[in-house]
Amino acid sequence: MRFTGLKYLQLLACLGLFACGSAERYDVVIVGGGASGTAAGLQAARMGARTLIVEEFDWLGGMLTSAGVSATDGNYRLRGGIWDEFRTELARHYGCDSALITGWVSNVMFEPSVGDSIFKRLVAREPNLTVWYRSAAETAERGKDVWRLGVRRDGRLRQVEAGVLVDATELGDVARIDRKSTRLNSSHP
């Protein structure tokens, strides 16, 4: 069979449609890798859900671990959960719980990079959890039983599907993208 220019272009177009048409499927997609988004991702993965965190930067923990706000109102009597794992890792890093009490503002203070590295270690331990750093959701559409997202990653728009979508961004980025499925204020019509 001889390929002419037009037939060759048609073949390439068909192959391109097949290559671009398949979406990556997750049970849960969390847009935003701040403290709440990372904690939600860890918990979903631990419950057996195939989970993706889409994070705009290469840093986890958001305002908890960056911008010089690494002083929490953490209570040492609050034992359990992801907060306790995080606090225990901080104490391990600095040598003991009392090493975290270094200021007037908080009972738990730490260097931002230490918080980021702890979250990254916790995430890396979870086989059901994937993090896409330097990525952003650009489109979001609610189907009958699935969310369809277009996520910009490595300069390419990737298609992702999930049964559950969590907007854990600082400013409600997904809510702004998907105005049909989301009410943007508390007023009622």
Show the residue positions of the predicted features.
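Core beta-strand elements of the Rossmann-like FAD/NAD(P) dinucleotide-binding domain
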Residues: 26, 155-164
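N-terminal Rossmann-fold NAD(P) dinucleotide-binding loop
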Residues: 37
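Conserved beta-strand-loop-beta-strand element in the redox core of flavoprotein oxidoreductases
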Residues: 141-159
